[in-house]
């Protein structure tokens, strides 16, 4: 029996794609010297479904059910960007109420995503209890989603120019109840996790990224904010109505896994703050922009004015994308989720480039795990927060 | 000799600290013993679906005008609309209509855009079969109403605590409508 003899009897270990802590189907080829990681090569593509190509043969309405399959834990964000890009391309305004509903849905989705990050991250570190606790709160969020949209994960709720349906009766109260309940849940997590010395030993100083490095690697979201850079697209881009709420960008300057944990926990609290404010002052009015189907010549009256005539009930299924291109982005829980959209005066987008946050954040992994121990791969990979559905698309 | 003693001392302190926090964690875990389980025994107990739940699609043959909007908004052009143009009435006559629920993803686009509301979402979600071709529903299968969960006496329904008594009456009324 002859094994390829390398420099110092290095061992090459294949982790994944079926490894439970690879968060899906990521495959890592890890070169080990004893317990130390010498090299790590991620291999992607096990969940590639050609989402960008599919978009080129679908109208936006037809494509909307697909998008929740990119990042299937932060489903509302994929829908938000899918409608935001054509909206910006065609300069479609959305009513205030629709914008508020979107904000509430997005922030609920952010909480759900961060919760399902927290559970597996702790499970990777060997703490199984939070994994069960998070599902309790997450289930409540999904109940809210089901009541409003009809499905727990594959909502198909956002439409060009608004949302598909208004909030059902009593939903607002249910949402407020959830906010109160969830704040107690966060306190429970923090008591359980944040000060725990075993947890701290595992995460403190592990996977350090300096601020400069984070920018150079193109990281975004909590990965970037944990390295001391206060960059949140909700503050920077002012999309939807995020500027009407009082909230702060969560950030830490340490740049290690613990900082990323703290940023995400803080973001969940901030999301609750945003939801509470949005629910408090949600305006009445239409939940859908009824202008989308208006004829061009009748566009004189001011939007939502008394004179304003609403023509269609639904945005047309034959929504045409004009021959322009643009890049639209939202702050998804994992980072900057963007679409580079090229229209071609037809129903189908000519190009639909997705910029998934997980994919860009994942590229720093080999550098982070080098010279660390084998067991730290789980911590670092967990703290990056990837979903293979959006990494491979 | 001296560094060894301090080493032992700090190790001891660390151990005590760890033990204390493990104790604190256990108190939180133990505080959960006092609550009811969140899960339900699925086949014997079922939670009532929300009103907007998107289950199997119901289709009314007589309402359909064969406009094929459902096909145009479907992500995979799934509904199969078989029609013939009748010259004497100058209308499209619908002959057959079928949806394959083995392929449908229940996105609800067809229901949303149907101009005559001949499509609707039911609360039926148990669609498992041994043969996938059984899931290809024609207009007759599509027009069947689902058995209401409330009407099934072998199943205990679990009500969400937030639902009020008004809801309760309403759902009992709907049972009498749904369940022939």
Swiss-Prot record, chain A:
EC top class, as a word: translocase
Misc. comment: There is a 56 residue fragment from the N-terminus in a second position on the plastid genome (corresponds to 9311163); it is not clear if this is transcribed.
GO biological process, one term: photosynthesis, light reaction
Membrane topology: Peripheral membrane protein
Name the UniProt record assigns to this protein: NAD(P)H-quinone oxidoreductase subunit H, chloroplastic
Naturally occurring in which organism (per UniProt): Oryza sativa subsp. indica
EC number: 7.1.1.-
Gene name linked to the record: ndhH
Keywords linked to the UniProt accession: Chloroplast, Membrane, NAD, NADP, Plastid, Plastoquinone, Quinone, Thylakoid, Translocase, Transport
Localization (cell): Plastid, Chloroplast thylakoid membrane
Assembly with partners or alone: NDH is composed of at least 16 different subunits, 5 of which are encoded in the nucleus.
One matching Pfam family: Complex1_49kDa
Top-level taxon of origin: Eukaryota
Family according to the record: Belongs to the complex I 49 kDa subunit family.
One example GO MF annotation: quinone binding
Primary localisation category: plastid
From Swiss-Prot, chain B:
Enzyme class: translocase
This protein's GO CC annotations: chloroplast thylakoid membrane; plastid
Cofactor note: Binds 2 [4Fe-4S] clusters per subunit.
Catalysed reactions listed for this entry: a plastoquinone + NADH + (n+1) H(+)(in) = a plastoquinol + NAD(+) + n H(+)(out); a plastoquinone + NADPH + (n+1) H(+)(in) = a plastoquinol + NADP(+) + n H(+)(out)
All residue ranges annotated as the 4Fe-4S ferredoxin-type domain in the record: 55-84, 95-124
Major place of residence: plastid
Pfam families given in the database record: Fer4_10
GO molecular function, one term: 4 iron, 4 sulfur cluster binding
Sequence similarity: Belongs to the complex I 23 kDa subunit family.
Stated name of the protein: NAD(P)H-quinone oxidoreductase subunit I, chloroplastic
